[in-house]
């Protein structure tokens, strides 16, 4: 079963829609970005929509103090680290805050993402694979070569495998059908002019659910 995360939430109406559509995770970006929110805003946003999907906080090379500040205001369910955080730091974060840690790894740069996984095994709950961009940590809207996904999935072993980068309603079916992605992470793919677009979100969710239903029906007949 594929789970869906919509990242870069800044507005109450968007969060309320994601709750209504039963999206699996919502992402709040605390790193410098056009989608950035501060700790207080995030806390107010989550409080405004009781029963919202589990919130994932996205950070790039944070300090422990920065994480503490955010968590004192916003009830996050997952900490996603999208920078050059070491395995040791990830373990410290997991132990200190008693929350799952997701580690983002870039695909397409000089570093071998599949090789990097090994040093984080047993520490993080999931690996997120996003397209390498020297000037931006995620949210680029660029798709990496999906032919690499099977090798990345194999390297993840027991950890969840999250695919991000350039995903939208027109290609999510291919991603789910050919590669059985565990978690799909979408941000710019449901935006218009940099703002979350309700219709694009609805269309994406419909495509994901339709593909899941088709897969379930096929499995039941097999």
UniProtKB/Swiss-Prot annotation:
Keywords: Amino-acid biosynthesis, Aromatic amino acid biosynthesis, Isomerase, Tryptophan biosynthesis
GO biological process: L-tryptophan biosynthetic process
EC class of the enzyme, as a word: isomerase
Catalytic activity: N-(5-phospho-beta-D-ribosyl)anthranilate = 1-(2-carboxyphenylamino)-1-deoxy-D-ribulose 5-phosphate
Highest taxon listed in the record's lineage: Bacteria
EC number: 5.3.1.24
CDD domains cross-referenced by the UniProt entry: PRAI
GO MF annotation list: phosphoribosylanthranilate isomerase activity
Coiled-coil stretches: none
UniProt cross-references to Gene3D superfamilies, sorted A to Z: Aldolase class I
Biochemical pathway: Amino-acid biosynthesis; L-tryptophan biosynthesis; L-tryptophan from chorismate: step 3/5
Statement: the UniProt record of this protein carries the keyword Amino-acid biosynthesis: yes
Entry's family note: Belongs to the TrpF family.
Protein's recorded name: N-(5'-phosphoribosyl)anthranilate isomerase
Organism expressing this protein natively: Brevibacillus brevis (strain 47 / JCM 6285 / NBRC 100599)
Lineage: Bacteria, Bacillati, Bacillota, Bacilli, Bacillales
């Amino acid at each position: 079963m594929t789970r869906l995360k919509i990242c870069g939430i800044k507005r109450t109406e968007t969060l309320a829609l994601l709750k209504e559509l039963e999206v699996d995770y919502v992402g709040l970006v605390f790193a410098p970005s056009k989608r950035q929110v501060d700790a207080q805003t995030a806390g107010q946003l989550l409080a405004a929509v009781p029963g919202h999907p589990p919130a994932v906080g996205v950070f790039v090379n944070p300090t422990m103090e920065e994480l503490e500040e955010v968590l004192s205001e916003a009830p996050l369910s997952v900490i996603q680290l999208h920078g050059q955080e070491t395995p040791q730091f990830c373990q410290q974060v997991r132990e200190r805050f008693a929350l799952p840690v997701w580690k983002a790894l870039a695909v397409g740069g000089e570093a071998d993402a599949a090789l990097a996984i090994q040093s984080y095994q047993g520490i993080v709950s999931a690996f997120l694979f996003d397209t390498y961009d020297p000037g931006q940590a995620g949210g680029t809207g660029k798709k990496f070569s999906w032919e690499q996904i099977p090798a990345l999935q194999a390297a993840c072993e027991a950890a969840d495998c999250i695919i991000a980068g350039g995903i939208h309603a027109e290609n999510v079916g291919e991603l789910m059908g050919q590669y059985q992605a565990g978690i799909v992470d979408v941000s710019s793919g449901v935006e218009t002019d940099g703002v979350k677009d309700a219709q694009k979100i609805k269309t994406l969710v419909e495509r994901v659910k339709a593909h899941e239903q088709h897969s379930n029906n096929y499995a039941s007949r097999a």
